[in-house]
Amino acid sequence: MQIIDGKKISQDLKNELKTDVAHFQASIGKVPGLTVIIVGHDPASQVYVRNKAKSCLEIGMHSTVIEMPHDTPQETLLQAIRELNQDPAVHGILVQQPLPKQIDEFAVTLAIDPSKDVDGFHPENLGRLVMGHLDKCFVSCTPYGILELLDRYNIETKGKHCVVVGRSNIVGKPMANLMMQKLDATNCTVTVCHSATRDIPSFTKQADILIAALGKARFITADMVKPGAVVIDVGINRIEDPSTKSGYRLVGDVDYDGVAALASAITPVPGGVGPMTIAMLLKNTLQSFRRINNL
């Protein structure tokens, strides 16, 4: 059984991006710029934003964080986005989720210039993904990170049966569309399971590649997995654990110990898919920089 080490691959990728950023700094005197907007003071969101800013700094990319109070009107946020759309030094715009209830998340997504939508959530980018124009869009960072892991670990995908458990707009839907594309690291037959699927194990047991992204701790158990399957665990769930200092620990959507005994390869939680998400955000921002500057 092979452990797919997202921590290592994300660091490898960041090192590669750092080299590219240094090259552009030396050759044209410019570097990519990412701006993150956070509305309110959600502790988890603040941690995510700090991690993104730290990763930008690590590779020499310019990073700006705009903090807005929890009661910010929607129009104020939209105006800030419109200004960033016009700023030539900003190549990536990300609005940290979740947003306060007075703000329509879809309206915010629509306001971001698709050419700077490095989260890959704008309908134009999703539409290009569905149509197979991956060279003209941004792919959502978590699915893109999973694709990078499969590629770098030389996981055979062509003609394989990929089962995606979960249908969120952030992971499940773009992941399923990505895995059916005609790419070296995809080209699968794809099945999507969700909360209304009857007899989910009957589908997961057919999977050559099983991607769990439903947000339920240890939902996928050994009796739901085909021996030799590649298992990608997207879930991050807190469960109580009195033996730890914090009183909890992180587990995925997969019962790791039981499934690892059967799988040919598996991502751990933490240290699997999670680290790849920020790395792919940086990669998307660099790609935006290249496109905007015709590089």
Curated annotation (Swiss-Prot):
Q: Which reaction does it catalyse?
A: (6R)-5,10-methylene-5,6,7,8-tetrahydrofolate + NADP(+) = (6R)-5,10-methenyltetrahydrofolate + NADPH; (6R)-5,10-methenyltetrahydrofolate + H2O = (6R)-10-formyltetrahydrofolate + H(+)
* Residues bound to NADP(+): 166-168, 195, 236
Q: Which protein are we looking at? A: Bifunctional protein FolD
What gene name is given for the protein in this entry?
folD
Q: What does this protein do?
A: Catalyzes the oxidation of 5,10-methylenetetrahydrofolate to 5,10-methenyltetrahydrofolate and then the hydrolysis of 5,10-methenyltetrahydrofolate to 10-formyltetrahydrofolate.
Q: Which family does the record claim for this protein? A: Belongs to the tetrahydrofolate dehydrogenase/cyclohydrolase family.
Q: Which PANTHER family match?
A: C-1-TETRAHYDROFOLATE SYNTHASE, CYTOPLASMIC (PTHR48099:SF5), C-1-TETRAHYDROFOLATE SYNTHASE, CYTOPLASMIC-RELATED (PTHR48099)
Any one Pfam family here would be: THF_DHG_CYH_C
